[in-house]
Amino acid sequence: MPRPHTGNLEQAPSWWPWLVGLTLIALFAGIGLRAPWPADEPRFAQVAREMVESGQWLFPTRGGEYYPDKPPVFMWLIALFYQLTGQLKIAFLLPSALAGLGTLWLVYDLGRRLWGEHVARSAVLILVFTPQFLLQAKGAQIDAVLCFWITLGCYGLVRHFLVGPAWGWYAASWVAIALGIMTKGVGFLPALMLIPLAIWRRRFDESGHQAWRLRAWWGPVLMLATLALWLAPMWLTVERVHSPELLAYRDNILFRQTAERYASAWHHIQPWHYYLTTALPTMWLPLVVLFVLRIRGIMDLWSSDAGLRILLSWVALVLLFFSLSPGKREVYILPALPMCALALACVWEQTPAASRRAASVLLRTVLVLMGVLLIALAGVAWLAPHRLPARADDYAEAVAALAPGVLLLGLALAGIPLLLRKRALFEQLALASLLTWLCIAFWLWPTLDPHRTPRAVLQELERQIAPGTQVGMLEFKEQFLLFAERPLVHFSYLAPLAQQESSAWHWMRADPARVLLVPDHLALRCFDLTRQSVLGQAHRRDWVLLDATALRERCDGPIGHALYRYVPVRKDILS
């Protein structure tokens, strides 16, 4: 069992409660102040909404069509909070925020048990100031919840084998692995921890306790039993109904979205070194800088600290696992961040103050420069908005409204290293991160929200058509379902555009009173886009309305039979 390190923590104890309180505020700040934003948030919110409206939770649906891309746990959580609160605008962000809070507690408690209070606090602060962590904890993507399950799995295994035995936590780790798999297929990653544990964890610890016993095999059995709670009803229902749609759902969720997606990814293709050369240097700053500057300290501790070896080896295995797949995204490596933060905190707290000076000077200087950059950006937004990037034109009004907040944030970031120079580096970085997220949650989100939803387009649609008119969509987006005031018809999200267009053409021919909502960038063969009626812009696309006058005489595209009609049970749920 590793001995706790006394370390030489710089921060005064009186600051710790304030930083904890500010972290709690930052995690939940802004909830209820914005709607789900593309690309992924509207999808998960709409799926959860349909679960509550239909009462059918086993097979997630999107606009009435089965959604086979992700297992259901994350959508279940949003749906549960929607039922509890009655407010989807609140419910869709709660799972990630609570997962972030849970991850912070697990890291703190594990660090305290392995190396003491100082390391535990530093590990929490590292997570707080590493951009990727709060970025995911404050969004409605799957990855923050996945990160919690994986961290819980690692926590249980490490607590049992390094500071145990703790058979209850060992069992909890395998349940967490199962829930992680039911959230996203890579939830099995904590099991990789068994490799370094087998190498460096002896069968008996110094106290004579035996961590490796025959009953350890019950862990994987418990994982399979937990998985069966979802897989068995799903599989049996598919076999009983045996419809093509459910068969396709089962095969997609179990095979195409797991092994096939890993081995033969069809999007986000990147070179093998992508995480080392692109993702880590951007999403894990300044953690990566601290690691590079403390390589020598890691090497010095490697032989004497089994906990450090085990955690860093697991992080390396996770990076290797994702690097071997051709499909790569920055967010995939988020689950490795908590254990990496713990390892860095261990090294940092055993680093003499003199050896920390280079990192402290460098990162404090970067913080000042970031503040100066934000001040300059605010000045440009006020005085010369035409010099901003072209995409800023989409948010011209918002940019002007945000300028005061950007200025204040810039002054705060630049002032922290100067006014609080006696405080510890990690405290300064964490405070800067938390102030940034408070500004984002209370200022940026409400200001940008009208520009990130299709509410204006749908309001114009209601003004142009009669109440009973049937509306169809090509290349439909979930956010339109969230804001719709009437039933919407779509022609399968999964179908290629040519098939959707052909289905829409036949649907409109059957009743000339029907209309079609489409983005105007589509190259359509069955419709005359010169007969369009402009509705407005949403998500950097111009949306138009086509009626029967836009139908061409013939449509030779592939005939599709999929047609889904979504009827909102409760309207204006995001008001």
Regions found by a protein language model. Give the residues of each.
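Transmembrane-helix motifs of polytopic, lipid-linked glycan transferases
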Residues: L94-L114, L152
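Extracytosolic helix-loop segments that constitute the early lumenal/periplasmic catalytic or substrate-binding loops
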Residues: I25-G30, R43-Y66, V73, L80
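Membrane-interface transmembrane helices that cradle and orient dolichyl/undecaprenyl
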Residues: R113-L114, G153-A172, G180, W348-T351
